[in-house]
Amino acid sequence: MNSEQSIRELGNEVPSEDLELPGRKTSNFQVLQPCRDEGASAECSIVECGKNYEPVISHQVIPDLNKETSVAYLQKELEILRASNTKLQEKLAKEDKEKRRLKLKLELQEKAAEADIAERTAALVEEVYFAQRERDEAIMCRLQLALKERDEAIAHVKHMEMSLKMLENINPKENDMTLQELLDRINNADTGIAIQKNGAVIVDTIYKTTGCRKRITAEEMSAVLEERDAALSQCKQLHQRLLDLKKQNQTSTNNTKHPTAKNNQEHTLKYNLNIASIN
């Protein structure tokens, strides 16, 4: 009874626009209340609805019609809402799944990017470390080489200073000694200092002798070259004179009185030219 009463109340609350059946034309109904003058058994008259005239339904039929249409409409609306709710839930689940997938994908991309950055950073740090180590090794090698060169230069300077001091301590009279005498003094020396001293004297003597010989040789070569140049110049002059005489001999055909003198002059020039060539 309660369910029927609630359905009736729901049917009474539904407006007339919601009671339209699908596929049926909407009609305007007007309920006629019984006239008080005629009593309860009076029937409703026909009234005008819009521009058309339709018979008026009795007011006793309206509650049942409202109840049936309301229940059918509500059931259909409930099914539509359920279907829409199901679709929305499916769409929401799909969107939630897509959201979680995108979130997981984004997290994986972030982790991959972090791993890539970490790997690159480690490789860069390792490269910088190796470069720094190679640079340090190169600097140490250069320092060691510089120290070695410095030590060698210092040793060479000390050796040169010692040799200079030994040469300064040499007696000038010892320069007049022969090489054999110096060698004898080295053989007869008792100490290493004496040997070094006599050896320095021998080396100095050899250097001086070599320099003197080179100087003498250069002077002699210069004199020889000068003599050669002078002889060549004289040969050229004599040769030119011989050519001139030949030309004069050929051109002076009219002068035949003294051929013997000209021939003698030519022989003299040839003789002088031969002598100059021999020299």
Curated annotation (Swiss-Prot):
GO terms for cellular component: nucleus. Residues 1-11 have a biased composition (Basic and acidic residues). The keyword Coiled coil applies. Residues 65-169, 218-255 form a coiled coil. InterPro entries: MIPOL1. Residues 1-21, 247-268 are annotated as: Disordered. The keyword Coiled coil applies. Residues 248-263 have a biased composition (Polar residues). Keywords: Coiled coil. This is Mirror-image polydactyly gene 1 protein homolog.
